[in-house]
Amino acid sequence: MARQKKYSGKGGARKKNKQKQSVAPRRRVEFKYKGFTLEELQEMPIKKFMEIVPSRQRRTMLRGITPNQRKLVMKIKKARRLTNRGKEPRVIRTHCRDFVITPEMIGLTFGIYNGKEFKEIKLVEETVGRFLGEMAPTRSVVQHGSPGMGATRGSMFVPIK
């Protein structure tokens, strides 16, 4: 016959106390980028925004924009106008992975090309100051299946099902 554990009675009391405590609702922490709120960032001129981003992004922005990036800016402005009217803008598809995410792009959905397909990404507050390419990785982990018949020397002696 199996021996039973002696019950000390302490564990049950702790559980009852935990049930009595009420859990406070979690408050969402207000987003800040380098001490600025999203509203302050959106009102900020682009020159001032360039001063607070890291040096790599600042250097990219100082070099100017290419014709492809200019097209992307026009698409962003068009999508912003649609959202101001209350319409849902379409996904903005782009190959520009080296474009810095600015505060005016927050809330829009982008299709970023990763070399094979367009990854749909909805930009949130935490992505400000990063590159679009960081949001759509170009490499993925390959999951190989089991090797087929004749793939290895040892499989020559395995009977076929």
From Swiss-Prot:
GO biological process: ribosomal small subunit assembly; translation
Molecular function via GO: rRNA binding; structural constituent of ribosome
Region ranges (Disordered): 1-26
Alphabetic keyword roster: Ribonucleoprotein, Ribosomal protein, RNA-binding, rRNA-binding
Pfam families reported for this sequence: Ribosomal_S19
Basic residues: bias regions: 1-19
Entry GO CC: cytosolic small ribosomal subunit
Protein name (Swiss-Prot/TrEMBL): Small ribosomal subunit protein uS19
